[in-house]
Amino acid sequence: MTEGVNLDELDQYLSSDESPENCMMLSDLDGLLHGVICSPIPISSDVWMAAGLGAEPKELPNWVVNTLTDRYMEIAQGLAHDPMVVEPIFWQAKAGHLIAMDWCEGFMKAVSLNPKEWLRLSESGSDGHLMTPILLHMIDEQGNLVTSPSVIENLALDTYKKRLDNRPMKDSLEHIRTDKGPRLL
């Protein structure tokens, strides 16, 4: 699905001195977009662009805003498709394995924009368990956070971590696997 959006140009911009100082890199930003789209309540583009790029949309080059809007629509269409089409942007290490942590951090940044709503979702017992694969990339083997989350993100992570501690690993991941790999709602 990502053929329609020029992600190479966006990646170059995000890595350049022209981008805002506090902007996310491409994988983080893609995780943020997925989180915004999956949010229990709508998040305005002004809010998520400022969170992801460290600047208001009016302060950004038009092509950057347009590219992000196109990627947002691409993700939303994939998630609305039956079956869902999810193509997250992960980095690949030189050794060949995928690095999902940056994407997961971006997703959790979206969670931090409406933490109470996400907490309600997790406590409702409906779909909160689907966060398990994302959170697994945020916690090391000893159960410690591998990033420095804000207080709000920490609240959400603690809630999910408690659920992880009370659930066998195989059971927590089994329900989100399909023949084509992991799903994200």
Task: Locate each region found by the language model.
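Domain-length accessory/inserted modules outside core catalytic folds
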Residues: M1-L185
